[in-house]
């Protein structure tokens, strides 16, 4: 065995060669690297930001959002897009379902004039476009809606009734292998919206599964299960849904946390409603009977009045949000939604 100084010298030479060939920082000792706060894109619901543990969707990662139909999956993704744009970021939306509603997106705060939109014909085309956009290094967030609609070219060009076993799963596996490393280098958040299917003949456990094979389950750093749990009514009219999101996988913080918030029809996630819920939970807002108070000042009688007060007084809402995030110790990287961490230039 070589002497310790010789081994150290050999290692230093190897590291110098790697840095020269692949760029500075390609290999480093873990202790050398300063701890970097996770840069995030806020979701629009403080309850969900808290459940994620870092204050939003982590940048440079793959996110999967799945659930039943009309549960609020696209709404969650569009709010993240709006927040990324608000911080000066560039967003793209790959509309494989050909169902994006520009009016609704605008109501949620998305700058539709600046949003990059693609409506591809095949799954291969959709993922190739997504890959090229990510490799540009200019994007902050890209949404693929949805995995189930990424139909392989062979299936589109084939006859009805033809068997195409495993084609979509292989397509997703190849795309994610190519994209994951690039996402990390460019700091782009990739949100894949997915649908649910049921496995036949399952006797025990949940028969529900997501489309597109197992690759997305493995590559996703965060998986969100979105469910509609009740309807919100104004008299007899249904005006929105109460939504529950479970963080079923989380590589950046503790998983299995849940968040509940209101999605109002035509308006999206109620940010003020979410602030009230979490504020009461954390004893920052006081609830006495039907009255809500904050630091001795009355917000209103009933949740709707309190929500209206916060909407009309954004400075109070921002103050409550800041106190919640400080108390729970999350959201340190939320302010850097557009910039992300300092990353070395990468030649693709």
UniProtKB/Swiss-Prot annotation:
It is found in: Cytoplasm. It comes from the Bacteria. InterPro entries: AAA+_ATPase, DNA_recomb/repair_RecA, DNA_recomb/repair_RecA_CS, P-loop_NTPase, RecA-like_C, RecA-like_N, RecA_ATP-bd, RecA_C_sf. GO terms for biological process: DNA recombination; DNA repair; SOS response. The keyword Transmembrane helix does not apply. Its main location: cytoplasm. One of its GO terms (molecular function) is ATP-dependent DNA damage sensor activity. ATP binds at residues 67-74. The keyword Flavoprotein does not apply. Keywords: ATP-binding, Cytoplasm, DNA damage, DNA recombination, DNA repair, DNA-binding, Nucleotide-binding, SOS response. GO terms for cellular component: cytosol. PANTHER family: MITOCHONDRIAL DNA REPAIR PROTEIN RECA HOMOLOG-RELATED, RECA. Can catalyze the hydrolysis of ATP in the presence of single-stranded DNA, the ATP-dependent uptake of single-stranded DNA by duplex DNA, and the ATP-dependent hybridization of homologous single-stranded DNAs. It interacts with LexA causing its activation and leading to its autocatalytic cleavage. Belongs to the RecA family. This is Protein RecA. It comes from Salinispora tropica (strain ATCC BAA-916 / DSM 44818 / JCM 13857 / NBRC 105044 / CNB-440). The lineage of its organism: Bacteria, Bacillati, Actinomycetota, Actinomycetes, Micromonosporales.
């Amino acid at each position: 065995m070589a002497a310790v100084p010789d081994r150290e010298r050999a290692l230093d030479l190897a590291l110098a060669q790697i840095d020269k060939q692949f760029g500075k920082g390609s290999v480093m000792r873990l202790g050398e690297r300063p701890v970097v706060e996770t840069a995030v894109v806020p979701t629009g619901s403080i309850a969900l930001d808290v459940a994620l543990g870092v204050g939003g969707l982590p940048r440079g990662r793959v996110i999967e959002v799945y659930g039943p139909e009309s549960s609020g999956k696209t709404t969650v993704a569009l709010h993240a897009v709006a927040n990324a744009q608000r911080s000066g970021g560039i967003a793209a939306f790959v509309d494989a379902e050909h169902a994006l509603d520009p009016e609704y997106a605008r109501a949620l705060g998305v700058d539709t004039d600046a949003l990059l939109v693609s409506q591809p014909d095949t799954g291969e085309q959709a993922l190739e476009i997504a890959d090229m956009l990510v490799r540009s290094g200019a994007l902050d967030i890209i949404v693929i809606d949805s995995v189930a609609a990424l139909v392989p070219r062979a299936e589109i060009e084939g006859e009805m009734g033809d068997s195409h076993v495993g084609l979509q799963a292989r397509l997703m596996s190849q795309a994610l292998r190519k994209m994951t490393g690039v996402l990390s280098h460019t700091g782009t958040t990739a949100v894949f919206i997915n649908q649910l299917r049921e496995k036949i003949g399952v006797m025990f456990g949940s028969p529900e599964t997501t489309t597109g094979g197992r690759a997305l389950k493995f590559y996703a750093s965060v998986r969100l299960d979105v469910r509609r749990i009740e309807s919100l009514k104004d008299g007899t009219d249904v005006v929105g849904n109460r939504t529950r999101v479970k963080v079923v996988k989380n590589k950046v913080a503790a998983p299995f946390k849940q968040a509940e918030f209101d999605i109002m029809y035509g308006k999206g996630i109620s940010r003020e409603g979410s602030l009230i819920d979490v504020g009461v939970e954390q004893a920052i807002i006081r609830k006495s009977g039907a009255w809500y108070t904050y630091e001795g000042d009355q917000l209103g009688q009933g949740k709707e009045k309190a929500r209206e007060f916060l909407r009309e007084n954004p400075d109070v809402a921002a103050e409550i949000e800041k106190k919640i995030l400080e108390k729970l110790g999350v959201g340190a990287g939320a302010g850097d939604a557009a910039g992300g961490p300092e990353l070395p230039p990468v030649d693709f």
